[in-house]
């Protein structure tokens, strides 16, 4: 029987068990047991990782362990016991560890979840459509479609700002760039944004002081907000600040935190008044789960059941 779970601290209010069990409630494991998901809470990363090694087939990883988990798999890879390929190698943080025949593999479904959520914002219904048409290859096809459609939606390269450069922010930065957006990085310490830009010169990231946040929002097409707390400027925004630029598409605002959103009801009302699109943190959670659970189980999750679980 495979065992699955989540490490991080604090995680007691996580919705991940709800989503995982909804994703596979109509399916059984090879031994006939149901798919279950545990919260492996604790502030000690090494203890949590050891528990994974001893007892679990695959785990999700959340704050504050994403970069520590990546570093651990890097160490294992040097010994021939770890696997790092694809976007996670550029991001330098992982939210998903899976035991394989080649060792522990690190993945990043924050990256895939962001791409899926943004594509869904611009093309409502596309995720379900592509799952139906392409099954386990839906994400690759979705990403390809979005890149091909970009020039039809924007008359010049669209611009994104990533606010926060932790593990989720790094994934957001790579996702935005891989989707064709020129990408600005903002962090409370500019040096961290600069370090990420220097580490990934192929993306031509532009580090910008966080004091420029308000002006940058006016000028960009996509905002991905990953800080755990709200910047004071959010209260100061008017609806006009969220208005689209000229003939471009509506401005899209996405945030990571679903427990305590930084864009409160008032801010979201201003976004709506400007005909902008707000993607709440639970949609990010949904799509990172949708794209990540396949790595954990080898099975396609039930998207409709997951959506119903979130709404319930």
Task: Label each PLM-derived region with a short phrase.
Residues 155, 177, 216, 237-250, ...:
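Short, conserved loop/helix-junction motifs that constitute active-site signature segments
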Residues 8, 105-111, 118, 122, ...:
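Glycine-rich adenosine-cofactor-binding loop
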Residues 68, 76, 230-254:
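Rossmann-fold NAD(P) dinucleotide-binding segment
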Residues 181-200:
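NAD(P)-binding Rossmann-fold cofactor-contacting core
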Residues 189, 213-236, 254:
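Rossmann-like NAD(P)-binding element
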Residues 2-129, 265-266:
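Phosphate/diphosphate ligand-binding glycine-rich loop within oxidoreductases
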Residues 251-303, 307-309:
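Rossmann-fold NAD(P)-binding glycine/threonine-rich loop
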Residues 46-48, 202-220:
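Short acidic low-complexity segments
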